[in-house]
Design a protein with these regions (language model features):
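Glycoside hydrolase catalytic-domain context in secreted enzymes
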Residues: 1-622, 640-644, 649, 738, ...
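Enrichment for repetitive, rod-forming helical segments
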Residues: 24, 159, 688, 698-699, ...
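Terminal connector regions
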Residues: 621-668
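Charged, amphipathic alpha-helical linkers/stalks
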Residues: 656-725
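N-terminal, non-catalytic alpha-helical interaction modules of very large eukaryotic scaffold proteins
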Residues: 727-730, 734, 738, 742-745
Length: 798
């Protein structure tokens, strides 16, 4: 295979080539001035750059340069606006080049398997098509300025608990249809130059060294020609990763990674021509993105313009969930009581590696209400974040509520509820907030709850309030965007990217999530989110794709042909509004189990009062396909398909059908062997049926009784060594302190979920792999042997 940069590579020594495959430091690749190879800088940035000014660290403990804090991915996904996603991506890139950033580590598009995942605020959707389309838009925007996007985390990375020591056990059809389709769209349509592998194993093999994922799917099938980077500290066997399709381990590991590669080349397990090919692919992106940052040096980005874009993005993404008696929009002069700590101190972004230092002080409702035309009769805090109910604060809030025309209660999830490194344990809002809403509705019937949260929540007070408006995490301009919606300056058009179940116990993965042992079994298979609820007919609070407007829309004139669907939408209300029409496809089959319907397209249409438009949604290569594990390829089953246009996943307003000549006459599944999967009732799939679906023996993920290098630090509690138990105990105390303070301790969370070998990957070579092995021995109670091993390894370290 010819190499684009073969002339450079052939001049390099084996050690120099090997050194290039690990980072120079936390954020940059190795540079070689004598070969003209520049360093390539990476930065977190799914919804805003986190370029650190001083010494870099993965968790953002050191301050980052000011950057626009856009709404998070979960927020923007509610807009269903690909053009908006591309605009945000372009703005992110414009900021990146002024900060000498070549690669933006985002967007994140893991599937929202469960509402409890702590990073759901960073991810687009529970649906892979929706997630993929939004991600591709971001990628196009970012790469339009000559730098690289880096979709993450590839793949089946659905929980934060023990995320670096977890094995996602998932059948191949589910893996392809649900957990990789979004990445496929981002790669094929967005032309992403890089991909970040996930921390977890997939069917027993770490993602960063999984040949099936990185070579057979990513390169051979999708045509990916960029580079793969490990998640920070996520490289397990560096040489095996390079052999199987990975390129770059981050952060830098000193000379440890270089020695691993050199050793593998010399012992024949990594052919040097494979190393050369990986280096060539990496250099292609290094050189391709270099000029953009050279051109951007010394330039400034449009702070005001990007702030305005952040507001526009938040406005398009607000979801109106309830509007009884048209309590909204609020008319000028309405006397409102503003209740809730979130009105004064907004929660506008999530916590973790995506934390942004905004260019402007984030707006609060109290900052913007003065220009709204409303009359604020009182503001009361009502509750203390992450604390038990406060009777005095609640009493003052209730008194204020008595004298208002409308009460605006600002509520949601606090900082400790959603963060990288932890998962929620329930779907409740804090007790203090729920009790406060109950008390206020007892004295005033005109209550509107304004929510801030990055994932779905339970709403026990739903029947007692007249309005519910959800802003998700709206970024630095989220408050003015929300006020514009509340007062009718903006007509709400957002629709939910995820289902809101009535109770967490109703969710399809309830019995399987999160995994406490190493194996995380995806027994619910295809039935994620609305695919489950619609198939079994389970009632939900709000379906996927749901959202109200201040106007109304009528659908008519459905036409279906081989190319797609055409229909008419009319604005039948009194104000201009935007509707998001959704295309769903379903098929009954005796030999292939399927959800009753799946999203296959969508259109965002803006209409003036009385205006109507003809809308066309085209079919594509994903409309009718399923992954056939008999042929290990995508197939289309012949037969009659139901073609549906809906306002959300539950409400189909136009229904047609189409006969499709497929590639196979039937599937290879049996109702007798897989009865639960054909019915969709997958709440308690037994081992026999799951083994049939999985196609192999289900791995035993239970702990072996001995601490291993790839066991998480949180498992040291079970070890025999006193030092390991003490370290675990200290971490637990620190976690409790952070919970009490109401802010996640990212450093502690990272350590808590990290495997022991992670210390050899995250300390820049200070801890070697041999030292990590010695620590493992000590954790198993071999104190003398382990200490001696540790000393020897430390002496040999260079």
């Amino acid at each position: 295979m010819s190499l684009k940069y073969g002339e450079i590579i052939k001049q390099m020594s084996l050690e120099e080539k090997a050194l290039m495959m690990s980072g120079k430091n936390t954020w940059e690749t190795v540079d070689f001035e004598k070969y003209g190879i520049p360093s390539m800088a990476m930065s977190d940035g799914p919804h805003g750059l986190r370029r650190q000014a001083g010494a870099g660290d993965h968790l953002g403990l050191n301050a980052s340069l000011p950057a626009t804090c856009f709404p998070t991915a979960a927020t923007i996904a509610n807009s269903w606006d690909e053009k908006l996603g591309e605009e945000i991506g372009t703005a992110l890139a414009e900021e990146a080049v002024t900060m000498d950033v070549n690669v933006i580590l985002g967007p994140g598009l893991n599937i929202k398997r469960s509402p409890l995942c702590g990073r759901n605020f960073e991810y687009f959707s529970e649906d892979p098509y929706h997630a993929g389309k939004m991600a591709a838009a971001y990628v196009k925007g970012i790469q339009s300025k000559g730098i690289s996007a880096c979709p993450k985390h590839f793949a089946a990375n659905s929980q934060e608990l023990r995320r670096m020591a977890s094995d996602s056990v998932v059948d191949e059809r589910t893996f392809r249809e649900i957990y990789t389709t979004g990445f496929e769209i981002a790669v094929k349509e967005g032309k992403s130059k890089s991909i970040m592998s996930s921390y977890n194993e997939v069917n027993g093999v770490y993602a960063n060294e999984n040949r099936h994922m990185l070579q057979e799917i990513l390169v051979d099938e999708w045509g990916f020609d960029g580079y793969v980077v490990s998640d920070w500290g996520g490289s397990n066997d560096h040489a095996l990763g390079v052999m199987n399709g990975s390129h770059l381990e981050m952060p830098g590991t000193g000379k440890s990674g270089m020695r691993d590669i050199v050793r593998a080349v010399k012992d024949g397990t990594l052919p040097e021509e494979v190393l050369d090919q990986r280096l060539d692919e990496l250099l292609n992106v290094v050189f391709a993105t270099h000029q953009a940052t050279v051109d951007g040096k010394g330039k400034k980005f449009d702070v005001e313009g990007h702030h305005a874009l952040a507001r526009k993005a938040a406005e398009e993404s607000v979801v109106l969930l309830k509007n009884s008696n048209n309590i909204l929009p609020l008319k000028p002069g309405t006397k409102v009581a503003v209740i809730g700590d979130f009105a004064k101190t907004p929660r506008y972004q999530g916590a973790g590696s995506s934390l942004v230092n905004p260019t402007k002080q984030p707006e609060s409702i109290l900052d913007v209400i003065g220009d709204s035309g409303l009359v604020m009769t009182a503001y009361e805090q009502g509750y203390i974040r992450n604390r038990k109910p406060n009777a005095a604060l609640a009493k003052s809030a209730v008194e204020a509520a008595k004298n208002a025309d409308v009460v605006l209660v600002f509520a949601g999830l606090d900082e400790i509820s959603e963060s990288e490194g932890l998962d929620r344990t329930h779907m409740h809002m804090p007790q203090a907030q729920n009790e406060l809403i109950d008390a206020i509705t007892a004295v005033n019937t005109n209550v509107v709850v304004v929510l801030s949260a990055g994932s779905s929540i339970e709403m026990p007070w739903f029947d007692y309030v007249k309005g519910i408006v959800h802003g998700y995490l709206g970024g630095q301009a989220g408050a003015s965007a929300m006020m514009n919606v509340l007062t009718g300056k903006v007509c709400p058009s957002g629709k939910l990217n995820e289902t809101y179940p009535l109770h967490y116990e109703d969710t399809p993965a309830f019995h399987y999530y999160p995994s406490k042992e190493r194996s995380s079994e995806y027994r619910e298979a295809l039935y994620v989110g609305y695919r489950y609820y619609t198939t079994v007919g389970k009632k939900v609070r709000f379906p996927f794709g749901y959202g109200l407007s201040y106007t109304t829309f009528a659908y008519s004139n459905l036409s279906v042909d081989k190319d797609g669907v055409t229909f008419t939408i009319k604005n039948t209300g009194d104000v201009e509004g935007t509707e998001i029409a959704q295309l769903y496809v379903g098929k009954q089959s005796e030999t292939i189990f399927r959800p009753v319907r799946e999203l296959k397209g969508f259109a965002r249409v803006t209409l003036a009062p009385g205006e109507e438009k003809s809308v066309h949604i085209a079919f594509d290569d994903k409309t009718f396909r399923f992954y056939d594990t008999r042929t290990n390829t995508w197939e289309v089953e012949s037969g009659n398909y139901q073609i549906m246009v809906g306002t959300d996943a539950d409400t189909m307003v136009l229904v047609g059908s189409l006969d499709v000549a497929g590639t196979v006459a039937e599937g290879g599944y049996s109702k007798e062997i897989l009865p639960e999967y054909f019915s969709g009732k997958i709440e308690n799939v037994d081992d026999i049926e799951y083994r049939e679906l999985y196609g192999r023996e289900i791995p035993d993920g239970s702990w072996s009784g001995e601490i291993q290098m790839n066991d998480a630090v949180c498992q040291l509690y079970y070890g025999k060594g006193i030092f390991g138990k003490l370290f675990y105990g200290v971490l637990r105390i620190l976690l409790k302190i952070s919970e009490w303070q109401g802010k996640p301790n990212l450093n502690v969370l990272f350590n808590y979920n990290m495997p022991i070998r992670g210390y050899a990957k995250m300390t820049g070579g200070f801890v070697t792999m041999e030292m990590a092995r010695a620590l493992t021995e000590m954790a198993n109670g071999h104190r003398i042997k382990g200490t001696a091993h540790l000393i020897r390894a430390a002496v040999k370290r260079d």
